[in-house]
Amino acid sequence: MKRILIAPVRFYQRFISPVFPPSCRFELTCSNYMIQAIEKHGFKGVLMGLARILRCHPWSKTGKDPVPDHFSLKRNQEGE
């Protein structure tokens, strides 16, 4: 199941992302965050990844935002 959820993200990383300049505001890119969240939390990781994408905009804070060990849709402020 996790492999099926990760496949579209890998497709994006391989074929779509290289066409555009880097724009993620976080140290762990949003696509890598999504993959790690899915690996840790399964389907809930998709929700976490989508919430992360919504947080990634020009007016958000930058920096580290690792995948938390528990399910959360909020930014992991570890290290701040």
Curated annotation (Swiss-Prot):
Record keywords: Cell membrane included?
A: yes
Basic and acidic residues bias located where?
A: 62-80
Report one GO cellular component: plasma membrane
Q: How does it sit in the membrane?
A: Peripheral membrane protein
Q: Which residues cross the membrane?
A: none
Q: Which domain of life is it from?
A: Bacteria
Signal sequence span is none
List localization entries.
Cell membrane
According to the record, the residues making up region (Disordered) are 61-80
| Alphabetical list of InterPro entries matching this protein | Membr_insert_effic_factor_YidD (IPR002696)
> Could you tell me the keywords of this UniProt record?
Cell membrane, Membrane
Family designation: Belongs to the UPF0161 family.
Q: What does this protein do?
A: Could be involved in insertion of integral membrane proteins into the membrane.
Instruction: Note the PANTHER family from the entry.
Output: MEMBRANE PROTEIN INSERTION EFFICIENCY FACTOR-RELATED
List the HAMAP family hit by this protein, alphabetically.
Answer: UPF0161_YidD
Q: What is this protein called?
A: Putative membrane protein insertion efficiency factor
What organism does this protein naturally occur in?
Answer: Streptococcus pneumoniae (strain Hungary19A-6)
